[in-house]
A protein has these predicted regions:
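Conserved small-residue-rich beta-alpha loop and adjacent elements
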Residues: 74-126
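N-terminal Rossmann-like NAD(P)+-binding subdomain of aldehyde/semialdehyde dehydrogenases
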Residues: 1-89
């Protein structure tokens, strides 16, 4: 299988900041709608170790620590995007809600291609 001829640049990192900061903004209200509550209930049904408090705490931590626009810009400003994207396999654990999110964020923002095997216990959230 051939990968697209995409070459990361500083514009790619800016785009990454925009996309993930927008996701952070959208997650600010997660857990308040009936749809969100159904997603949480489905995740708990899939993984009996998850609680709604754990899920909400994970989403809030991701939003505040990983998806804050200023923090993303500062973090990514320290790196140069790759000029030779690699395929990065991410095998996600399912013991903590959304535990594989940071791996995905790092892979995509560095300009690599993510190949993900989500945990069978965290498919609803990821």
């Amino acid at each position: 299988m051939s990968l697209p001829s995409w070459r990361p640049s500083s514009d790619t990192m800016k785009e990454c900041v925009e996309i993930f900061a927008t996701l952070g903004t959208r997650l600010a209200t997660f857990g308040h709608t009936e749809r969100d509550k159904a997603i949480i209930a489905s995740a708990i049904e899939q993984n009996g170790w998850f609680t709604s408090e754990d899920i909400l705490r994970a989403v809030e931590a991701i939003r505040l620590e990983m998806l804050d626009r200023d923090k993303l810009q500062l973090w990514l400003s320290r790196y140069t995007p790759t000029t030779h994207p690699q395929r990065v396999a991410i095998i996600m654990a399912g013991n903590i809600p959304l535990v594989g999110f940071f791996d995905l964020l790092c892979t995509l923002c560095s300009g690599h291609h993510a190949y993900i095997k989500p945990s069978s216990k965290d498919r609803v959230l990821m």
